[in-house]
């Protein structure tokens, strides 16, 4: 199946460097089995800190699971070197923020939640634990004395 990139698009107001924080950041995804096409009903998360051994000593992945329909063992791995921030200059454009190595599992939907951080453009103030589940976030930058926000968060998956 190969590599699949998650691209984010958002409107940033007075913030930049929107990024996932830490190896325990949870990427909430819905997955499709590459063998039978079954799509998971529930959101599943994968984290950089999780590593599961593949059968037959073929390395490891962030998630290994057996398809409920066809019983095939599939895996997906977060490629840590591909994690990128979404910056002010990326405003309202799709930008790859992470890539996944997919072996039988294909991400088909993404739900941003808590664990993001961003910096004030003028002040450098760090806004931590940003939750994007509602696709919008607002706050106030005391140092710069201006409102800050992230709006209209959307995503797409593209094959690399």
UniProtKB/Swiss-Prot annotation:
**Entry keyword set:** Metal-binding, Phosphoprotein, Zinc
State the InterPro entries in the record: CXXC_Zn-binding_euk (IPR008584)
Question: What residues does Zn(2+) bind to?
Answer: 33, 36, 67, 70
- Residues recorded as bearing Phosphoserine in the entry: 75
Pfam families in UniProt = CXXC_Zn-b_euk
Any one GO MF term held by the record is: zinc ion binding
Domain of life the protein comes from = Eukaryota
Q: What remark about domains does the record contain?
A: The N-terminal and the C-terminal half of the protein have a very similar 3D-structure, suggesting they arose from duplication. Requires a bound zinc ion for normal folding and solubility.
Q: Which PANTHER family match?
A: CXXC MOTIF CONTAINING ZINC BINDING PROTEIN (PTHR12857:SF0)
How does this polypeptide assemble, per the annotation?
A: Monomer.
Q: Family, per the entry? A: Belongs to the UPF0587 family.
This chain belongs to the protein called CXXC motif containing zinc binding protein
| Source organism per UniProt | Mus musculus (Mouse)
